[in-house]
Regions:
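Conserved N-terminal phosphate-binding loop of PLP-dependent enzymes in the Aspartate aminotransferase
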Residues: 1-189
Length: 189
């Protein structure tokens, strides 16, 4: 059985490792990647074990394959990640963000599970009976947006605050986010 790791959202330093799968004790046969590789330029790729790649011998064609501009952007992104140590920065800033959310969780009982790796973190908002609280999430997201912070909505019930800030985010940026989030959460009814 083949195991494929989809790194479209989680790859390229997002989780405090170059690829999210590196946080676990498994090795995929195939990895698919996109989005962050181009930092806005349209590009995707896949890699595989050599025994799989060696079986791919038929010629193929792709309308969008081999684009030199996107390929150049991908190389520049990889260079930037390495030169600016963004894997480690994601781990450190992600810990700061997650620790800050856990501190808020102790203050606000409507924050349920806080989870994530690196700079891919979620905080679940719940009602007193532990049911999802999408209404609370809507208030928090919209009020934070009015303050200049974009926070995603996630989860089946749309009750999970989804934090995926830029990998270049600073300690001060995260402190500002957490301070504003604290103030907004103090207004949740």
């Amino acid at each position: 059985m083949l195991f494929r790791s989809d790194e479209v959202q989680t790859g390229f330093a997002r989780t405090g490792k170059m690829f999210a799968i590196e946080n676990y004790d498994v090795e995929p046969d195939i990895m698919t990647m996109a989005k962050a590789l181009g930092n806005g330029a349209p590009i995707s790729c896949f890699i595989s074990r050599s025994e799989i790649a060696d079986k791919y011998t038929r010629p193929g064609a792709s309308t969008l394959g081999g684009n030199p501009v996107s390929s150049t952007a991908g190389i520049a992104v990889l260079d930037y990640i390495e030169e600016h140590n963004l894997v480690e920065k994601s781990r450190v800033r992600g810990k700061q963000l997650k620790d800050g959310l856990i501190a808020l969780q102790e203050k606000y009982p409507f924050i349920g599970d806080v989870r994530g790796l690196g700079l891919m973190v979620g905080a679940e908002l719940i009602n007193p009976d532990k049911s999802p609280a999408p209404d609370k999430l809507e208030f928090v997201v919209e009020t934070m947006k009015d303050r200049g912070f974009l926070i995603g909505k996630n989860g089946i019930a749309r009750n999970v605050l989804a934090f995926q800030p830029p990998l270049v985010i600073s300690e001060e940026n995260i402190n500002d986010l957490l301070n504003n989030l604290d103030d907004v959460m103090s207004q949740v009814k």
